[in-house]
Amino acid sequence: HYVYEKIKKNVQLTSISGGTDIVSCFVLGNPNLPIYAGEIQCKALGMDVAIFDDNGKEIYKKKGELVCKSAFPSKPLFFWNDNNNIKLQKAYFNKYNNIWHHSDYAESTENNGYIIYGRSDATLNSGGVRIGTAELYRVVENINNVIECVAVEQKYNNDTIILLFVKLKDNIQLDESFIKIIKDKIKSNLSPKHIPAKIIDVLDIPKTKSGKIVELTIKKIVNNEKIYNLNSIANPECLEEFRKKSQITN
């Protein structure tokens, strides 16, 4: 709403879901269609996009897995130095047989648009409720003095808990009163299930060189798993803070 209220009312503001591997988008904007807040406008031309549940059943107006059911013009034939297409198969075809699984947690809408809730392999599970990280970030990053945040699951006592890491503005302390503000905002805007077990302040949040938060790397760090490739991370030095502070919960 900010852009339309403060900058310009008749601008096309939209997002996408796609990727480098397909040199394209599965869902994207269209200047001939209306724009609805929080939604990507439509499927891309030539893309047989759908939302599947975990059993491979197509669902509507419910959260699930973004897939492409048919071949498309820019579908990669193979990855470089990937003998027998092992990496390609593991990346996109392991979950559903012969159907491209894009690993976006998404929902189709009554407007024929799409909502992306985050990467499906980084979604959180709280008491059996699946939570997309993007919906949590939208609430937390709208709180005054929060610059950005990231949430991941940590294994704990044969279960998992949600850790929320927040980067705050300079000279702002994450004290008990601020933690309560964050939890209350999450509860009122989302649900009690969305409230993390721990809220932890960090100096910086690790990102790729293209600016994407590396949720899966952070998840591995807090679960004491081996990280094999740090070359794509622009600020790997901040990972150690995540490792140290996350161990407080164990």
Stretches found by the model and what they are:
Residues K220-K226:
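Short arginine-rich
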Residues L13, V49, C149-A151, K198-I199:
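Generic structural signal for residues in well-ordered beta-strands
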Residues H1-G113, S120-T123, L136, N142:
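Conserved AMP-binding/adenylate-forming
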Residues I16, F52, V152-Q154, V202:
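Conserved beta-strand termini and adjacent loop/short-helix elements that scaffold enzyme active sites
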Residues V11-Q12, I162, I195-K198:
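Residue-level recognition of the N-termini of beta-strands and the immediately preceding loop/turn
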Residues I199-K209:
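Short proline/glycine- and acidic-rich turn/helix-capping motifs at secondary-structure junctions
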Residues K43-G46, F242-N250:
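Acidic, glycine/GT-rich loop-and beta-edge segments that sit at the periphery of enzyme/chaperone cores
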Residues F72, L77, N98, S103-H194, ...:
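AMP-binding/adenylate-forming catalytic core of the ANL superfamily
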